[in-house]
Curated annotation (Swiss-Prot):
Transmembrane residue ranges: none
Species lineage: Bacteria, Pseudomonadati, Pseudomonadota, Gammaproteobacteria, Pasteurellales
Recorded catalytic activity of this chain's protein: ATP + H2O + 4 H(+)(in) = ADP + phosphate + 5 H(+)(out)
Subunit structure: F-type ATPases have 2 components, CF(1) - the catalytic core - and CF(0) - the membrane proton channel. CF(1) has five subunits: alpha(3), beta(3), gamma(1), delta(1), epsilon(1). CF(0) has three main subunits: a(1), b(2) and c(9-12). The alpha and beta chains form an alternating ring which encloses part of the gamma chain. CF(1) is attached to CF(0) by a central stalk formed by the gamma and epsilon chains, while a peripheral stalk is formed by the delta and b chains.
Compartments in which it is found: Cell inner membrane
The entry's keywords: ATP synthesis, ATP-binding, Cell inner membrane, Cell membrane, CF(1), Hydrogen ion transport, Ion transport, Membrane, Nucleotide-binding, Translocase, Transport
Protein name in the entry: ATP synthase subunit alpha
HAMAP family in UniProt: ATP_synth_alpha_bact (MF_01346)
Gene Ontology CC terms, in alphabetical order: plasma membrane; proton-transporting ATP synthase complex
Function recorded in the entry: Produces ATP from ADP in the presence of a proton gradient across the membrane. The alpha chain is a regulatory subunit.
Species in which this protein is naturally found: Haemophilus influenzae (strain 86-028NP)
Length: 513
């Protein structure tokens, strides 16, 4: 068989037409050193700050130091098998985590991967972990309450939707217990919750998850776990990942509550990363931008207005505001609130709940110190009935503390002073509350009414706890309809005042104290 020149030329033309070459430009580099979870890379000329760098074995590192001839990056996960000379490449993306309702009821790691053994999470939405906080024009003032269920908190340091309220205290003073009870109290409020555990023991996190499940709050909660066994990079990024998950609800006109437990450990993880990257240390060896570490996180907690939600959802949600309320936790050393990280976070947040080890050890739990605990914006969000009835609580406690210190040195006291001391002791006793026993607005109102209008004056100090239990049982059993209505509205007027008075009068008439 012979081919003529025309056929050959046609065949060549056909082959040339079918020839397809795809050229792909990739920005690659080479690892030049690996140490303590930090890798130095040579050759990545176009890398961005915070960009994800693809490593061998389906892992990623995050570029943090951009130097003249190398890039310092922190590895997200195990790094023992990484070696000098390995090739890495830019991805052109910053870190994103899955967000959405599919994560509710699940325990995930910093990267949003499930670690609870319940299978994959069905999810299509992703959000960057670093997002600029809403601007001043997009925000709305805080005027709706977040009920924690604690008498001491809801009456003296109320929290509003969109507020940042710091929980600060030494170790073992009930900081996590307070935050977990606040989450449990939201199970029927419609507020979605995110609990971010940073640098805690895995057994402690498992215990928290079990308690949330026992009290029916896990289905409404996302748990982001970066335990003590995780790398410093994952502990540093966990709060930002949790915040991105909370912002999903805020930006769609819903309300969310996020607990960061705790930001002291995040600051330590960031200090570790910064020192390994050879960044210059500052006060207490923290890097110079440790304030910015927390401010850019906590500024993302806010209440946004209807226009913001409508613009974000492209008109799907109208006439709704969204909020993300933050409860950051800070652990102090020997009650020193003037240390670097505590003062930073106090200055960023809208108030603080200070828990004292002396109060905790003397049996006053929650160990809230009313003298230095404050809520800067929560007062305008407080439920009307609680606001009206709780006015005398803080004053009574302040006078009691002052007189108690004086009474230690004075032997004979006049009747007015004795009366004030007795009242202060009873109020202190009444504000005690067990864990996992949050109270509704109506239940708190009944108790505060009893304090405000002298129904405790003839009750012995040792019987205060049983008086409270019996009073709540009587109110819920005999006035269920009124209690439900008060929970719904939270209003206070002459009619409600008369009803509360009749409840207390009826209770005192039927039982002797």
């Amino acid at each position: 068989m012979q081919l003529n020149s025309t056929e050959i030329s046609e065949l060549i033309k056909k082959r040339i037409a079918q020839f397809d070459v795809v050229s792909e430009a990739r920005n690659t580099g080479t690892i030049v050193s690996v140490s303590d979870g930090i890798i130095r890379i040579h050759g990545l000329s176009d890398v961005m700050q915070g960009e994800m760098i693809a490593l061998p074995g389906n892992r990623y590192a995050m570029a943090l130091n951009l130097e003249r001839d190398s890039v310092g990056a922190v590895v997200m996960g195990p790094y023992a098998d990484l070696a000098e000379g390995m090739e890495v490449q830019c991805t052109g993306r910053i870190l994103e985590v899955p967000v959405g309702s599919g994560l509710l009821g699940r325990v995930v790691n910093t990267l949003g991967q499930p670690i609870d053994g319940k299978g994959e999470i069905e999810n299509d939405d992703f959000s960057p972990v670093e997002v600029i906080a809403p601007g001043v024009i997009d925000r709305r003032s805080v005027d709706q309450p977040v009920q924690t269920g604690y008498k001491a908190v809801d009456s003296m340091v109320p929290i509003g939707r969109g507020q940042r309220e710091l929980i600060i205290g030494d170790r073992q003073t009930g900081k996590t217990a307070l935050a977990i009870d606040a989450i449990i109290n939201q199970r029927n409020s419609g507020i979605k919750c995110i609990y971010v555990a940073i640098g805690q023991k895995a057994s402690t996190i498992a215990n928290v998850v079990r308690k949330l499940e026992e009290h029916g709050a896990l289905a409404n909660t996302i748990v982001v776990a970066a335990s003590a066994s995780e790398s410093a990079a994952l502990q540093y990024l966990a709060p930002y990942a949790g915040c991105a998950m909370g912002e999903y609800f805020r930006d769609r006109g819903e309300d969310a509550l996020i607990v960061y437990d705790d930001l002291s450990k995040q600051a330590v993880a960031y200090r570790q990363i910064s020192l390994l990257l050879r960044r210059p240390p500052g006060r207490e060896a923290y890097p110079g931008d440790v304030f910015y570490l927390h401010s850019r996180l906590l500024e993302r907690a806010s209440r946004v207005n209807e226009d913001y939600v409508e613009k974000f959802t492209k008109g799907e949600v109208k006439g709704k505001t969204g909020s993300l309320t933050a409860l950051p936790i800070i652990e102090t050393q020997a009650g020193d609130v003037s240390a670097f990280v505590p003062t930073n976070v106090i200055s960023i947040t809208d108030g603080q709940i200070f828990l004292e080890s002396n109060l905790f050890n003397s049996g006053i739990r929650p160990a809230v110190n009313p003298g230095i605990s404050v809520s800067r914006v929560g007062g305008s969000a407080q439920t009307k009935v609680i606001k009206k009835l709780a006015g005398g609580i803080r004053t009574a406690l302040a006078q009691y503390r002052e007189l108690a210190a004086f009474a230690q040195f004075a032997s004979d006291l006049d009747d007015a002073t004795r009366k004030q001391l007795s009242h202060g002791e009873k109020v202190t006793e009444l504000l005690k509350q067990k864990q996992f026993a949050p109270l509704s607005v109506a239940e708190q109102a009944v108790i505060l009414f009893a304090v405000e209008f002298g129904y405790l004056d003839d009750v012995e100090l040792s019987k205060i706890a049983s008086f409270e239990t019996a009073l709540l049982d009587y109110s819920n059993r005999n006035h269920a309809e009124f209690m439900q209505e008060l929970n719904k509205t939270g209003n206070y007027n002459d009619e409600i005042k008369d009803t509360l008075k009749s409840i207390l009068d009826g209770f005192k008439a039927n039982s002797a104290w």
